[in-house]
């Protein structure tokens, strides 16, 4: 099967592939347009770590930084970052705009994240998300909000306001259920006010491979103790994702979701994130091949994207094995491993990692402002 056929075959099954990457040369070279035209790429995601690598790790932004500071010498480091990021993502959104229109607003999105320092402040998250969405000024822009308790609160407000939202750093089915509920409440508020539903789109970014990265060493300890855990290695991340998808399907069949769909709402799709394989013993497309299903997105880093184009498999895999997934999670508890505490830890670590990348990036921009880079 050709690369084009793989991506388009996934679309026929109801899944869209997005690109978990942004850098200015992706736009300048025409490569992004080529990926959309030739491969069928459906969207793009960014985060502070991706922008840290793009801006701090290359010289591609040197001229843009100089020009921005000449135009507005009063820019602080964070304002300078958002100016650079918005420039990139507006251009990317424009490249995706024909796809957005062709799909009736269902696909062709780009995502910009609020400051990770706001992860536990709902009001500040709402203010910044509204401001960034207005500055992006593109119908196919999404604002990324972390899936913390504060982020869930912000989500409901933002959806009701008409802001497209990508809820990120989701690790547990319980937190995802809260996110889906908040999305429904936000959409119901719009419906009650007689406002359009089809113009507001959201995804819920559920992180996958990091779950196995934490659990596999714990399972190895149990194996060394002679306990039955070998069958769970490399399985729990996919099981966790399958249970999230099962919850989505249950809710989609319910009266509230049906009412929203009838009024024009696009479903809040699950977006599989952190799908690059970190364990070299596993297939490099494990978290792509195993998570294919209708009304989902998978955002792939470049290496995983290329691997899937080369040798990925295309078949519906998400809806199967739900009872097996439940049994695997139950077996984990029998081994004395608390999945909820693991996912809570992963949420905290994810926020800290983005904060660290953000601080590093702002430090680099501070040096640039002082003429040190």
From Swiss-Prot:
Protein keywords: Cytoplasm, Pentose shunt, Schiff base, Transferase
Record-linked PROSITE patterns: TRANSALDOLASE_2
UniProt key word Cell membrane: no
Record localization: Cytoplasm
Its EC number(s): 2.2.1.2
Chloroplast is among the record's keywords: no
GO biological process, one term: carbohydrate metabolic process
EC top class named in words: transferase
Molecular function per GO: transaldolase activity
Pathway: Carbohydrate degradation; pentose phosphate pathway; D-glyceraldehyde 3-phosphate and beta-D-fructose 6-phosphate from D-ribose 5-phosphate and D-xylulose 5-phosphate (non-oxidative stage): step 2/3
One Pfam family, short name: TAL_FSA
Catalytic activity: D-sedoheptulose 7-phosphate + D-glyceraldehyde 3-phosphate = D-erythrose 4-phosphate + beta-D-fructose 6-phosphate
GO cellular component terms given for this protein: cytoplasm
Residues forming the catalytic site: 144 (schiff-base intermediate with substrate)
Similarity-based family: Belongs to the transaldolase family. Type 2 subfamily.
Role noted for this protein: Transaldolase is important for the balance of metabolites in the pentose-phosphate pathway.
Protein name: Transaldolase
Organism: Thioalkalivibrio sulfidiphilus (strain HL-EbGR7)
């Amino acid at each position: 099967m050709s690369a084009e056929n793989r991506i388009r075959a996934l679309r026929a099954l109801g899944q869209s592939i997005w690109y978990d990457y942004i850098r200015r040369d992706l736009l300048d070279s025409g490569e992004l347009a080529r990926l959309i035209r030739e491969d069928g790429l459906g969207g793009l995601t960014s985060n502070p770590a991706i922008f840290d690598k793009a801006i701090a790790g290359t010289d591609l932004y040197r001229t843009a930084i100089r020009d921005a500071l000449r135009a507005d010498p009063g820019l602080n480091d964070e304002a300078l970052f958002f100016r650079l990021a918005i420039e990139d993502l507006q251009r990317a959104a424009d490249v995706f705009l024909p796809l957005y229109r062709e799909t009736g607003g269902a696909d062709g999105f780009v995502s910009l994240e609020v400051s990770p320092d706001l992860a536990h402040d709902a009001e500040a998250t709402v203010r910044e998300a509204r401001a960034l969405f207005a500055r992006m000024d593109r119908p196919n822009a999404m604002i990324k909000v972390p899936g913390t308790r504060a982020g869930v609160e912000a989500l409901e407000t933002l959806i009701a306001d008409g802001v497209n939202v990508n809820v990120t750093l989701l690790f547990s089915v319980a937190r995802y259920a809260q996110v889906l509920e908040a999305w429904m409440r936000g959409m119901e508020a719009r419906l009650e006010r007689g406002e359009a539903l089809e113009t507001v789109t959201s995804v819920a970014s559920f992180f996958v491979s990091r779950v196995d990265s934490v659990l596999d060493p714990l399972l190895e300890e149990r194996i060394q103790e002679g306990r039955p855990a070998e069958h769970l290695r490399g399985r729990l991340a996919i099981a966790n994702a399958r249970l999230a998808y099962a919850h989505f399907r249950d809710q989609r069949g319910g009266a509230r979701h049906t009412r929203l769909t009838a009024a024009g709402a696009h479903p809040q799709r699950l977006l599989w994130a952190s799908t690059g394989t970190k364990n070299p013993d596993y297939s490099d497309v494990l978290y792509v091949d195993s998570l294919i299903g209708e009304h989902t997105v998978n955002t792939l880093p470049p290496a995983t994207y290329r691997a899937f184009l080369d040798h990925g498999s295309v078949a519906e895999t998400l809806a199967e094995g739900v009872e097996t997934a439940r049994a695997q999670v139950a077996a984990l508890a029998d081994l004395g491993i608390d999945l909820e505490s693991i996912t809570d830890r992963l949420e905290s670590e994810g926020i800290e990692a983005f904060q660290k990348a953000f601080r590093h990036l702002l430090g680099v921009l501070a040096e640039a402002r002082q003429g040190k880079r």
